[in-house]
Structures are given as C-alpha cells and as structure tokens.
Amino acid sequence: MAVYVVTGKLGAGKTLVAVSRIQRTLAKGGIVATNLNLKLHHFPQVGRYAKQCRVMRIADKPTLEDLEAIGRGNLSYDESKNGLIVLDECGTWFNSRNWSDKSRQPVIDWFLHARKLGWDVIFIIQDISLMDKQAREALAEHVVYCRRLDKLNIPIIGGLISVLSGGRLPLPKVHFGIVKYGDNPQSLTVDKWIYTGTDLYAAYDTKQIFTSDRELSPPFCPVSPYYTHGIFAVKRDAKYYMRMTKIYFKKMNRVWLMASFLALGAGVGFFYKSRQINEQLSNMPVASAQANTTKTDHTIDELPRLSINSFAQMGYDVNVSFKDAKGKIYYSFDLMKSGYALDIKDSCHITLRKRNYIQQVTCEG
C-alpha cells in the first residue's frame, strides 16, 4: 500500500498529478473515492463510452462515517489492484489545530488500516508542516514536492533575456513531482514524475471551493460517462464522415466549381498549345536541315592544301608541322584536338582524316 502526501505552492499542479493517478486507476478498472468534482467524460483514457466507471464522491471534509461507507477498495491480496482515495485541501481539516477534536482520532485510525481495506491514499496539502505531527509520522510514507518549469528562471541566460526584451524567458509549462521516501526534504528520492497534463485540465473543477457544510457536498456516486454523454454522442463511423463530407462540400461547392472550371480551362489550353508545337516541329523541312548540316560540317572539316614543313620523332612521340600555300603553319597536336586523325607512313607521306574528309600530305605539297 502506498500513501502519498502531495505538496506544493498554489498553482504548482498538486491536484493535476492526483487526477492523473485517478485516471490511471480508472483505466485499469480500479475504484476511486475522492472529494474532487470530476468530469469523467473528459478523461482521455476513460472516455465518454465507459460503462463501468466506479467513482465515489465523498464529502469535502470526510468523517469516519464517510470513510466506512466506501467499503473495501480491493477484495484480493494483489495490492496492484487497490482502490485509490484522493483527498484535496487537507490543510483545512487535517491540521494540528483541528486534531484536538475527538472525532479526528478515529479518522487517523481508519487511515492506518486503509491498507488492509485495499486502498491507496493521496493527501493533497500545500505544505507537509500543515499536517498534524502524529498523522504526518504515521501516514506520510511518500512526500511529493511539485514544481512548475515555467515559474523557474535560468541563471545568467534568463537575466540577459530579461534585460534585452523586458520580459522573462518563456519556458514550457511542465510539472515536476519529486517523490521522497519519508517526510524529510533530505530523504531518499525514489521517483520523479514529469508531466504536462494539458489533456486533464477539463477533467476536474479547478475552481472548486471546499466547505464543511455537508448539505452542499453530500456523498454520492456519479453515473458512468456512457449514460450521461456516450449514449447521446454521434458515432464517428463511415456514415458520419460521409455525411460531414457532404455538408462541407455543399458549403464549398461554389468555390470548388470555380476552381474546377479554371483547372479544366488551363488543362485544355496547355493540351492544344502542345499539339500546335508538335505539328510545327513535324512540318519542318528535315532534308534541307540535313543538307545544311552536312554542308556546314564539310566546310568546317576541309583544310587548304598542305605540305609537310617539319617532322620530328622521339620514341613513340611524333611532332609534325604543316604549311599551306600562304605560309600558315598547322601543328599536328592542334589538328588532333580538332578531331583529325594522322596516318603516318613515313616522314614525307601523311594522311589526314576527319569524317568523310581525306587529304594526302607530302613533303613537296
């Protein structure tokens, strides 16, 4: 059996972490007794279609009769199936000033035997010192210290941003729960709860006011979410999505119709334009283009009448220079770069080739 005393300043997320534990207990089929006003259909892991959601709403400031009325939380010996009791604002009725009341001692005796009755207990209080010493030493097995990340400031960096922007460094709203084994802040840390809980904000009344008037907060058992919300909810099946699609289509039909006509007109225009371009390309005089290309190639490939001006060979390297009738010199490596092939028979007989062009070059010219 685990007893947690959840502590923290105002707005630190004490109730939020307790509600998350309530959700976990309900999700695995356990029983919950609490003085919180819960909205069961807003629990994400429970949902509005849950038919067996066992929750007991006890008085804001429960007495021994209220605790005895909830019965047992677990009939088996498996403590993982224990029920959960969550009591908020314990500082108003679980403190040393009210503990002199004779009706308080039977309450602490009941909580001492809660394990045998199959209950885990969570007390929510702003500070552990507000709880009576006798109850604190007897019941405070674990103490949870809640902190909020967005209320902290990063040293140095936070100060620089505050000076430059005139505001605090915005940090995410993340809640930390540091679980200590015992009521001493220096006790061993046994666990750390890190959570955001944004999906649980709507699951309980954050503005609930606790009162000692039992007529304003009588015990009762809330009805399962299925019978209050699920039975009236619209089933989101294939018919639902088809119906929603038709509704949105009717709202947007004019816009869709206009966009469809624009797209159709653009598509037809591109189609006819591409056909015109293809017809123009197919009607071009292919023969004349080939003739012009051949003529141009021959013109480029043809060389003036050449003669061998010099011939030098060192091993496999041959360097030849040619000369035309005007005395212009042509070097063999330049001709080879231009695509000409040199067929050397001897120093006075060389053949130049490029495509269909052939010229026999000799020493005499």
Curated annotation (Swiss-Prot):
Function: Isoform G1P plays an essential role in phage assembly. It is required to increase the number of adhesion zones between the inner and outer membranes of the host cell. The extrusion of neo-synthesized phages occurs at these adhesion sites. May be involved with G4P in creating zone through which the phage assembled and extruded.
Similarity comment: Belongs to the inovirus G1P protein family.
GO biological process entries: viral extrusion
Subcellular localization: Host membrane
Entry GO MF terms: ATP binding
Assembly: Interacts with G4P; this interaction results in a complex that spans the inner an outer host membranes.
Top-rank taxon, per record: Viruses
Ranges that cross the membrane: 255-272
Gene Ontology terms: cellular component: host cell membrane; membrane
Species the sequence originates in: Enterobacteria phage I2-2 (Bacteriophage I2-2)
Pfam families: Zot
Keyword annotations from UniProtKB, A to Z: ATP-binding, Host membrane, Membrane, Nucleotide-binding, Transmembrane, Transmembrane helix, Viral extrusion, Viral release from host cell
Binding-site residues, ATP: 8-15
Gene: I
InterPro entries xref list: P-loop_NTPase, Zot_N
Keyword Phosphoprotein (UniProt): no
Name this protein carries in UniProt: Gene 1 protein
Membrane topology: Single-pass membrane protein
